[in-house]
Amino acid sequence: MTGSAEETFEVARQLGESLSGGEVLALVGDLGSGKTTFTRGLVCGAGCADYARVNSPTYVLEQVYQGRVPIRHYDAYRLGSPCELDELGFQEALSSRAVLVVEWADRVESLLPADRLLLELSFAGVEREGEGPGDGRLLRFSSSSAAWAARLASLGGACADNEQG
C-alpha cells in the first residue's frame, strides 16, 4: 500500500531500475487509481530523463520512451477489441527488447503473454494523522513467474504483498 502519488511513483521507480528489457506489465484499475503515475515512476527508474512528460496515451493509444531500456506504454481504455492493439504492432513489440506497459490490460488479456506482471491498483482511503483522507493506493502484484516474484521480494515495502501462481 502507498499513502500518496509520490509513494506510488517511488515503488514504480524502484521496479523500473530492475528492468532489463522484454518484460510485460499489465496494469488494471479504475480511472484515477494511479496507473499512469505508476508508469511515470517506472519510466524514471528505467533511465528516461524525460519521465515527467509521461501521460496516459488514451487518445494516441501508444507512447514510446527511451532510456536504459525502451518502454512502450499502451492504453487499452478506448479499444473496441484486442485486435486494435495488435494493429499497433503489439505482437511485434512482444518480441522486442522493449518493456511493454499496458493500462486497462484486462481489455486485451488475450494478447498478453502468460509471463507478465499484473498490477491491480485501487483506492485505499489512507488517513494520515492530522491530514485526513489521503491519496493512498493498494498495489496488488501477481505473476506466475518465479523471476517476477523474486524481483518483487527484493524490493520489499509495498511490493511485499505479491502473489505467485
Where are these regions (language model features)?
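Conserved lysine of the Walker
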Residues: K35
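N-terminal pre-Walker A segment at the start of P-loop NTPase domains
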Residues: M1-Q14
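Post-Walker A helix-loop "phosphate-sensing" segment adjacent to the P-loop in P-loop NTPases
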Residues: C44-R53
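Phosphate-binding P-loop
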Residues: G16-G22
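P-loop (Walker A) phosphate-binding loop of NTP-binding proteins
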Residues: V28-D30
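Short phosphate-coordinating micro-motif centered on Lys-Gly-acidic
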Residues: L85-G165
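Short hydrophobic/aromatic beta-strand immediately N-terminal to the Walker A/P-loop
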Residues: V24-A26
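AAA+/P-loop NTPase substrate/partner-engagement loops
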Residues: S56-H73
